[in-house]
């Protein structure tokens, strides 16, 4: 038997799909040449058949003289027709073993590594098997760009395993949801309405700020951020800032926590009766105008009402006729009610009544018709000395 026949016999011993041992003969930048043990033929092991990382260094995976188990993929004929070479793969052999290990592991949580952002989701690798996480299963919120997960290792839940169709689907969202639920239950177990706790500002919206309480986000509504009115949330807090907040309400079923920042600091109405009293005359700024009056800020955070009837001695239909927002005015305090957080004010109490108006009132009083004075009924006798006549003189000529 000649050398060529020996070569053919050795080739016949190698079949596509076989798992064989191979010794590394040489290594260059992109591939390694191996000798398939017991056959007398060689194989080619490319970087692509070693790892999914296209930027990897092949020397990190194989060394000359090292013996590896590889999977025979197909026969490759070289330029010399007498030379037969096989393309082999270490990566696919490991993947086959990994697929076998995946059978029956649906719903199990495993750690994967993100390899590439693709259309519709993220490619990941787990023990040599390439898997896929749809974008809708990456997070609790839809992820439009999966690039941030590339190169990251994270826990996922196995949802589908089908080796024949090379289908390996996982979900990161379910793991995140489970972790969030566990953290939420733990946090809710420690919280109570009325507690003052420390949290970190997670995000700011037009209607308030969300505070991270260590697993649960609570909302400080715009109205609970400050004692001042019409403030912008961004002017009160900043993202990342740690603040103390008071718990107003808890709803574990809905995962909702209502918080207040202003309840943790003294309010403008605290001790207001020592700062403001009935009869005081103070300067203020018109803050708001309504149909029934004007609200004037007399102390920081304290607006008093000047009723429309207290704006001027003249009759006005609308406060806008006499005042405008931002105007500085002098007012007299008519009443202070700290419990009701109400202050009544007057502008006209500091103004003299117009002389013309006083004259008109006097004229009205003078022109008013006087009612006749009632005469008292009296029983009396007319003495003769007063009339000069006696009763006989008055009725003497009357014939009966």
Swiss-Prot record:
Keyword Nuclease set for record: no
Region Disordered, as annotated, extends over 351-400
Q: Which InterPro entries match?
A: NA-bd_OB-fold, Ribos_protein_bS1-like, Ribosomal_protein_S1-like, S1_domain
GO terms assigned for molecular function? mRNA binding; structural constituent of ribosome
Q: Which Pfam families match?
A: S1 (PF00575)
Q: Where is the signal peptide?
A: none
Its GO biological process annotations read: translation
Tell me how the protein is altered or processed after translation: Phosphorylated.
Q: Which Gene3D superfamilies match?
A: Nucleic acid-binding proteins (2.40.50.140)
| S1 motif domain ranges (all copies) | 17-87, 107-173, 194-262, 279-348
Q: Where is the composition biased (Basic and acidic residues)?
A: 351-366
* Record GO cellular component, one term: cytosolic small ribosomal subunit
Q: Which UniProt keywords apply?
A: Phosphoprotein, Repeat, Ribonucleoprotein, Ribosomal protein, RNA-binding
* Alphabetized SUPFAM superfamilies for the sequence: Nucleic acid-binding proteins
Is Zinc set as a keyword in this record? no
* Cited PANTHER family: 30S RIBOSOMAL PROTEIN S1, SMALL RIBOSOMAL SUBUNIT PROTEIN BS1C
Per the record, the similarity remark reads: Belongs to the bacterial ribosomal protein bS1 family.
Note the NCBIfam families from the entry.
PRK06676.1
- Tell me, in a sentence or two, what this protein's role is: Binds mRNA; thus facilitating recognition of the initiation point. It is needed to translate mRNA with a short Shine-Dalgarno (SD) purine-rich sequence.
Q: What is this protein called?
A: Small ribosomal subunit protein bS1
């Amino acid at each position: 038997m000649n050398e060529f026949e020996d070569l053919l016999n050795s080739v016949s011993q190698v079949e596509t799909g076989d798992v064989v041992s191979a010794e590394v003969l040489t290594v260059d930048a992109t591939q390694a040449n191996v000798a398939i043990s017991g056959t007398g033929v060689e194989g080619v092991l490319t970087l692509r058949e070693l790892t999914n990382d296209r930027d990897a260094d092949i020397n990190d995976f194989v060394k000359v003289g090292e013996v590896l188990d590889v999977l025979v993929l197909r026969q490759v004929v070289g330029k010399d027709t007498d030379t037969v070479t096989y393309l082999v793969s270490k990566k696919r052999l490991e993947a086959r073993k990994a697929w076998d290990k995946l059978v029956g592991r649906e719903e199990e949580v495993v750690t994967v590594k993100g390899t590439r952002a693709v259309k519709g989701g993220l490619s990941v690798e787990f023990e040599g098997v390439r898997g896929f996480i749809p974008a809708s299963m990456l997070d609790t919120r839809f992820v439009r760009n999966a690039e941030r997960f590339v190169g990251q290792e994270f826990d996922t839940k196995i949802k589908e395993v089908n080796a024949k169709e090379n289908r390996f689907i996982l979900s990161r969202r379910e793991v995140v949801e489970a972790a969030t639920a566990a953290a939420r239950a733990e946090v809710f177990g420690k919280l109570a309405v009325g507690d003052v706790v420390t949290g970190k500002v997670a995000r700011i919206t037009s209607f308030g700020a969300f505070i991270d309480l260590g697993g649960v986000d609570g909302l400080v509504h715009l109205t609970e951020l400050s004692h001042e009115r019409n403030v912008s949330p961004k002017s009160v807090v900043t993202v990342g800032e740690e603040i103390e907040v008071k718990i107003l309400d808890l709803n574990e079923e809905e995962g909702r926590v209502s918080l207040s920042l202003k309840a943790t600091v003294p309010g403008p109405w605290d001790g207001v009766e020592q700062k403001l009293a009935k009869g005081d005359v103070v300067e203020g700024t018109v803050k708001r105008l309504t149909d029934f009056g004007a609200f004037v800020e007399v102390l920081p955070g304290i607006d008093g009402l000047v009723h429309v009837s207290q704006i001027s001695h003249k009759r006005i239909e609308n406060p806008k006729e006499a005042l405008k927002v931002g105007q500085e005015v002098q007012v007299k305090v008519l009443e202070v009610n700290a419990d009701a957080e109400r202050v009544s004010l007057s502008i006209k109490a500091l103004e003299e009544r117009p002389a013309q108006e006083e004259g008109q009132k006097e004229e009205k009083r003078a022109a008013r018709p006087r009612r006749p004075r009632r005469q008292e009924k009296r029983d009396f006798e007319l003495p003769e000395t007063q009339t000069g006549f006696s009763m006989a003189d008055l009725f003497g000529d009357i014939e009966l």
